[in-house]
Amino acid sequence: MEVLDTTVDLGTLQGKSALITGGASGIGLATARAWAAAGMYVTIADIQPLETGQNILADLAGGHVHYVCCDVTSWESQITAFKEAIQFTPSKALDIVAAFAGVSFAGGNQVDHVLAAGDPRLDVNPSPPDIRNIQVNLIGVYYTSWLGLYYLRLSPTNKAANPSPDKSLILMGSIGSYMDSPKASTYPASKFGVRGLFRSTRARTRELGVRCNLLAPWFIDTPLIAPMKKAMAARGIDMAQRLTFASVDACVEAATTCAANPQLHGTPPIRYAYCLKT
């Protein structure tokens, strides 16, 4: 098992531009904070209202940070976010796209939901299932990946603003991209899908001059798992006593390594602090 060298020169990020979907909370916000501190032009695209974005911008005052409301399940909304991110940068080009938007673990195996629908009948149609996990975590990431590979090819109008040609696409999977989960269906389906997208895409993104990597964090105590913690608590289980959470800082370090290390691309199995695995 190869160990990831996280020694990176943050100076290489100075002046670069990034779009982070899901950047208003959790790993996305922590990454935006770190990259802004490194001197990057960071656009946060998130479904949270503009007021939330304005509060984030106030908190990150002094950095080059832009906020745009974005529903990642909407193709048009994502195009708007990409165009705003490009216009925000002096180079009028993007260097890094981080597809971090996601919704929390939705419990219930598909079999549970089928049984809950009752005995099969021909005179009544069953209600459609809740597939928001798949819509946001997989389709949304697919849209971001597609548009990232499309817009990352733009040449900077001002090469002096950022002369580096290195481009990076970072996809957000999870431990659910690798681990069986008989207690749920849509969340692991979405995360296995992101892993499949990564494994099929990484072989060819170099043709477009783009590096592609996958983050697959272990459980992290962020707002994303709040519903899971609540459900476990209702059963008398304290997740904090049963699990050792990975840290947000470790995930940010892994994301920054993917962004800054020009040699890191679609690498065979790497494990980094329960956080990065390909």
UniProtKB/Swiss-Prot annotation:
Its EC number is 1.1.1.352. It holds the Pfam family adh_short. The active site is at Y187 (proton acceptor), K191 (lowers pka of active site tyr). The modification N-acetylmethionine is found at M1. InterPro entries: NAD(P)-bd_dom_sf, Sc_DH/Rdtase_CS, SDR_fam. Its main location: cytoplasm. NADP(+) binds at S25, I27, Q48, D71, Y187, K191, I220, T222. Disruption phenotype: Cells accumulate 5'-hydroxyaverantin. The keyword Cell division does not apply. One of its GO terms (cellular component) is cytosol. The keyword Coiled coil does not apply. Keywords: Acetylation, Cytoplasm, NADP, Oxidoreductase. It is found in: Cytoplasm, Cytosol. One of its GO terms (molecular function) is oxidoreductase activity, acting on the CH-OH group of donors, NAD or NADP as acceptor. It is an enzyme of class 1 (oxidoreductase). Pathway: Mycotoxin biosynthesis; aflatoxin biosynthesis. It catalyses: (1'S,5'S)-5'-hydroxyaverantin + NAD(+) = (S)-5'-oxoaverantin + NADH + H(+); (1'S,5'R)-5'-hydroxyaverantin + NAD(+) = (S)-5'-oxoaverantin + NADH + 2 H(+). One of its GO terms (biological process) is aflatoxin biosynthetic process. Belongs to the short-chain dehydrogenases/reductases (SDR) family. This is 5'-hydroxyaverantin dehydrogenase.
